[in-house]
């Protein structure tokens, strides 16, 4: 895979490979775009089958966060952290705090929130090592300020966008 070529073609700014063998941390932080502000996105803890799978997921999800932030008219860009681990058996305070130290090295370019496999308590551990993220997002992942919104039959809302309709699965904590 031509990683730098892919990143350039998709508009990614940075990828950080994080390794701390002492605590078993293997993580990737992808920053897609910081034009509107710091990259914001959750930290996904997942037992990826390969490093390449984890890298591609981080890149894909960071790009999606750029568009979510822009659609919600937030002064944020898109980013994503992924930790290669089983959230049920390998997640420890030491691992999360180590991840927080890597987030801190980005000096505010990336703000970490929760995602699949991570909890509010996990973010407290991350936050002990960085003032840049490590908090639960209070922002909805679906923007509430479109032209018109009404409850849908399922969860969440249906938003009317000056023409096409788009369904969103509620507020969620995942990106």
Where would I find each of the regions flagged by the language model?
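Residues in well-ordered beta-strands of folded domains
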Residues: 17-19, 30-32, 46, 84, ...
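GHKL/Histidine-kinase-like ATPase module
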Residues: 12-17, 23-30, 42
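Short helix/loop capping segments that flank catalytic or ligand/cofactor-binding pockets
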Residues: 26-27, 54, 93
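Gly/Ser/Thr-rich helix-start
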Residues: 25, 38, 42-43, 78-82, ...
């Amino acid at each position: 895979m031509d990683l730098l070529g892919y990143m350039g073609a998709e508009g990614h700014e940075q990828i950080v490979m994080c390794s701390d063998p002492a605590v078993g941390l293997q993580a990737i932080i992808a920053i897609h775009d910081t034009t509107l502000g710091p990259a914001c996105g959750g930290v996904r803890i997942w037992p990826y089958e390969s490093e390449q799978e984890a890298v591609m997921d981080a890149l894909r999800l960071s790009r999606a966060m750029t568009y979510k932030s822009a659609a919600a008219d937030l002064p944020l860009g898109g980013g994503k952290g992924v930790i290669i681990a089983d959230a049920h058996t390998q997640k420890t305070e030491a691992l999360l705090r180590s991840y927080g130290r890597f987030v801190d090295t980005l000096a505010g370019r990336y703000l970490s929130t929760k995602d699949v496999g991570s909890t509010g308590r996990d973010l407290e551990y991350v936050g002990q090592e960085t003032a840049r993220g490590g908090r639960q997002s209070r922002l909805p992942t679906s923007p509430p300020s479109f032209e018109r919104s009404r409850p849908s039959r399922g969860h969440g809302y249906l938003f009317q966008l000056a023409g096409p309709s788009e369904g969103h699965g509620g507020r969620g904590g995942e990106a």
